[in-house]
From Swiss-Prot:
Family (UniProt): Belongs to the pyruvate, phosphate/water dikinase regulatory protein family. PSRP subfamily.
Organism annotation: Pseudomonas syringae pv. syringae (strain B728a)
Chain sites annotated for binding ADP: 152-159
Lineage: Bacteria, Pseudomonadati, Pseudomonadota, Gammaproteobacteria, Pseudomonadales
EC top class named in words: transferase
E.C. number: 2.7.11.33, 2.7.4.28
InterPro entries for the chain: Kinase-pyrophosphorylase, PSRP
Protein name: Putative phosphoenolpyruvate synthase regulatory protein
């Protein structure tokens, strides 16, 4: 079964898309064609949006699902004339919250993502720069400033996880790829030993690792199943021997991996 889903906002669309994606993910038996439409901030754009929604309804022969975070009442009323099932995120959550807090919300566009009013902005940038500068074991002499150091075989998800933690939570995360030489020594590399308390391991199913590496270096020893299986087995053995907490990243999203890492290591988010 297929349905169209629209994430519509008069701002960036981040809130509508994030919440909408989370809700739609609960319906695994349905395939959704997803469309993000940010900055629908005028009557003309709203009318054009209605036409897009109606076209999707005609094509699918079923009304689309619409997640919106539109602040302007006139624009919301225009969207409501479309042949779609609307979920107005702001009105759904703000109305009961206003009642509980005995206060009216500001209904401001892009409030949570404003750079000018976000005291965490520079800290976020610094964390991202740290993750980039300390990616792939590039600069181990800065590990004393890291909150977390992810370790694991090449292409198991270390870099995207570090960047996500930096962007979302201001975590200074470094990562170090364990190589075949490290495995042959049967011990942690010298650069990691003095930061053992910051280490967290990522592992991955060999067949998934093979597929990922094949996209980068097809038909190579690096991407062969035998090599991937060997590296994963040896690294998992190293994690157990050195008592390093670790998880298998195969079936988890970057968001889930990040949350598990922070909980396991007891690291507090710099901002929430």
């Amino acid at each position: 079964m297929k349905r169209s889903a629209f994430f519509i906002s008069d701002g960036t669309g981040i809130t509508a898309e994030t919440l909408g994606q989370s809700l739609l993910a609960q319906f695994e038996n349905i395939t959704f064609n997803k469309f993000t439409r940010p900055y629908i901030d005028s009557v003309e754009k709203a009318r054009a949006m209605v036409q897009q929604i109606n076209n999707a309804a005609d094509k699918d022969d079923v009304r689309p699902i619409i997640f919106d975070t539109i602040v302007n009442q006139d624009i919301r009323e225009i969207l409501a004339t479309s042949n779609g099932f609307m979920i107005d995120i702001f009105s759904t959550f703000l109305a009961p919250l206003e009642q509980e807090l005995s206060s009216h919300s500001s209904y401001s566009v892009g409030k949570s993502h404003s750079i000018g009013h976000n005291s965490n902005y520079m800290e976020r940038i610094e964390a991202v720069n740290f993750a980039l500068d300390n990616d792939d074991g590039a600069r181990t002499h800065y590990y004393d400033k890291a909150d977390i150091i992810l370790v694991g075989v090449s292409r198991c998800g270390k870099t995207p996880t570090c960047l996500y933690m930096a962007m979302q939570f201001g975590i200074r995360a470094a990562n170090y790829p364990l190589t075949e030489d490290d495995m042959e020594r049967l011990q942690l590399p010298a650069a990691l030993k003095q930061h053992r308390e910051k280490l967290f391991g990522l592992t991955i199913d060999p067949d998934r690792l093979t597929a990922i590496r094949h996209e980068r270096k097809p038909n190579s020893r690096y991407s062969s199943y035998a090599q991937c299986e060997f590296e994963v087995r040896e690294v998992e053995s190293l994690f157990r021997r050195e008592n390093i907490a670790h998880i298998n990243s195969t079936h988890f999203s970057v968001e889930e991996i990040s949350a598990k890492v922070l909980v396991e290591k007891g690291v507090e988010r710099r901002f929430k």
